[in-house]
């Protein structure tokens, strides 16, 4: 790995820690089951899939009524690695393509990633966070239950 990859990976570690600490997911239990479930998303699920992933990315902002701002690839990939069932990871990357790495956002460089790049980066995250990702669904379900959702 080069220095940029190390920085990107460290950014994803920080994103994953934020996800774990956050109790705010702006999704219903039905949408959470859709997001984390093993049912393969089909073409007609595209809008719902994007809405569900975005709800996890922007949940806190949406909950308090603040406007959204573009999330970096590292955060979106962490959300996909953390919440989306493996059978739907490629589809999630397809519907979420177009984000940019944090380094590019900071430097004002416009270079959106495509689905293949987002997928490759998500795989890198899943490889590095195996134990954390494996426990993600139960962790999130416990938080939903604690907030009164079943």
From Swiss-Prot:
The record lists the membrane-crossing segments as none
Q: Which UniProt keywords apply?
A: Host cytoplasm, Viral capsid assembly, Viral release from host cell
| NADP found in the keyword field | no
Q: Where in the cell is it found?
A: Host cytoplasm
Q: Which family does it belong to?
A: Belongs to the microvirus D protein family.
Q: What does this protein do?
A: Assembles the procapsid by joining twelve 12S pre-assembly complex into a T=1 icosahedral particle, called 108S procapsid. Ten proteins D bind each 12S complex, which are formed by three pentamers of F, G, B protein and a H protein. The scaffolding protein is released from the provirion after genome packaging to form the mature virion.
Quaternary structure, from the entry = Component of the procapsid particle composed of 60 copies of the internally located B, 240 copies of the external scaffolding protein D, 60 copies of each of the viral structural proteins F and G, and 12 copies of protein H.
Q: What is this protein called?
A: External scaffolding protein D
Species whose genome carries this gene = Escherichia phage alpha3
């Amino acid at each position: 790995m080069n220095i940029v990859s190390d920085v990107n990976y460290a950014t994803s570690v920080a994103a994953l820690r934020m996800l774990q600490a956050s109790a705010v997911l702006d999704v219903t239990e039905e949408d959470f089951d859709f997001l984390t479930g093993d049912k393969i998303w089909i073409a007609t699920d595209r809008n719902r899939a994007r809405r569900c992933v975005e709800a996890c990315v922007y949940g806190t902002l949406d909950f308090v009524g603040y406007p959204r701002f573009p999330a970096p690839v590292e955060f979106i990939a962490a959300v996909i690695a953390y919440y989306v069932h493996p059978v739907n990871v490629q589809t999630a990357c397809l519907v979420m393509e177009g984000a940019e790495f944090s380094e590019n956002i900071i430097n004002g460089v416009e270079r959106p990633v495509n689905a293949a790049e987002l997928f490759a980066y998500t795989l890198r995250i899943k490889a590095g966070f195996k134990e954390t990702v494996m426990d993600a669904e139960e962790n999130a379900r416990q938080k939903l239950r604690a907030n009164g959702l079943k």
